[in-house]
């Protein structure tokens, strides 16, 4: 007698599959947001492309805004840390290394496209755009803070130094990328941007360190 194969009843996926559903939903959302823009993408489109039911989508994300935030947060959280330097670096060297890594990621075509998407949502949904921008900015800030703390030579105010460094290094190149300047030109000037920022911070006394503890 042949065993009768039970049909899936749908509903919530097993725990070992839940992460895969989330990944597919965010992959689909990213693809559609970049192809169509935020306004012309619906939650139904995302669920369909992901091969998931609308119930699965809404069980995880309240609305399209929440999906958009999750897409950006995943990009920030999965951004690789700068490769470890081959030799120990002083504070200035660590910041130089981190700054080059931040700009390398920021100038990638998909990153620039995501930034343009955020700008495009700012008129209709300024609160959403502000929140998404905060997520991205804080992600870069955390990486710089980790870089600063990864050594015995510590500045008087690591948090302030990290914030000023991110603003000086990232914001100008971000604006130029959004305005359509060729990525190759921006990449070619990335090192000079980092050196300019370090020079300003040094002149302001923010790179001065105390004795190792």
Residue ranges of model-derived segments:
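Hydrophobic/aromatic residues within well-ordered alpha-helical segments
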Residues: 64, 71, 75, 95, ...
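Amphipathic alpha-helical linker/stalk segments
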Residues: 69-99, 106
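Amphipathic alpha-helical packing segments from all-alpha helical-bundle domains
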Residues: 93, 112-113, 126-153, 163, ...
């Amino acid at each position: 007698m042949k065993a009768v194969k039970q049909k899936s009843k749908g509903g919530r996926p097993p725990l070992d599959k839940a992460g895969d559903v989330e990944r597919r939903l965010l992959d689909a959302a990213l693809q559609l947001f970049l192809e169509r823009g935020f306004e012309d993408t619906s939650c139904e489109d995302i669920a369909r492309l992901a091969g998931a039911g609308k119930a699965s989508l809404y069980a995880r994300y309240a609305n399209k805004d929440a999906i958009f935030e999750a897409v950006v947060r995943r990009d920030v959280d999965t951004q690789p840390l700068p490769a470890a330097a081959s030799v120990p670096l002083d504070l200035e060297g660590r910041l130089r290394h981190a700054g080059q890594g931040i700009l390398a990621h920021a100038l990638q075509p998909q990153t620039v496209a995501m930034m343009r998407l955020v700008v495009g949502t700012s008129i209709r949904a300024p609160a959403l755009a502000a929140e998404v921008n905060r997520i991205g900015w804080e992600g870069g800030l955390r990486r710089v803070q980790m870089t600063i703390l990864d050594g015995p030579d510590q500045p008087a105010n690591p948090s302030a130094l990290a914030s000023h460094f991110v603003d000086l290094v990232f914001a100008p190149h971000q604006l130029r990328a959004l305005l359509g300047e060729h990525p190759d030109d921006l990449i070619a000037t990335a090192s000079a941007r980092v050196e300019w920022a370090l020079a300003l911070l040094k002149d302001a006394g923010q790179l001065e360190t105390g004795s190792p503890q």
